[in-house]
Amino acid sequence: MSGDPDRPAPLDLGAGRLEAFSDAVMAVIITILALELRAPLGPTVKDLYDQLPSLFIYVLSFVFIAIYWNNHHHLLRATTRISGAVMWANMLLLFCLSLIPVVTEWLHDFYRSPLPAASFGIVALAAAFSYSALVRAIIRANGRDSLVGMAISSDLKGNLSLVLYAAGVGLARFSVCAAYAIYAAVAVMWLIPDRRFTRGAGRR
């Protein structure tokens, strides 16, 4: 097995089981999010227009969770060893993602207010930190010369996301539109396919 021979071997709890559990939790989170989506209050174009902010918030939240599901899938598919630290880091990520429906519901009612807008960024920032912690735990369990270790030798996009989320939280006090624009920009940035795992597999 690759990795440092002096490092204690982690308990192999099965990446497949961890991925299946995480998929189920994320599916529940998306279901809760969808149940909170509100229909227009009337049959007119104006009623539909009035509902556009809530629709934007729903789409942003849905894409946010979908991005994490996609990256989580590729991350665990490149993982061969799962340690206890990986399990806990994964639970922390799921906890942060479970807060998305809460802040989304708050934004539905108060999308013009700075605090709810900043709260979305805080949850997004916490999720980004927890995903980074999960990546580090997986690399420690598998070794830096493993597929996942080579694929994520650097994480410029992840670090940039942290900076942008923090900027969005700070800007929410002065302009909620600017904060939403930053959150949306991060989502668009992550919609671009990540080729790191493919490149890492090619170097094996």
Identify the function of each model-found stretch.
Residues S2-R204:
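Multi-pass alpha-helical transmembrane bundle typical of ion/small-solute transporters
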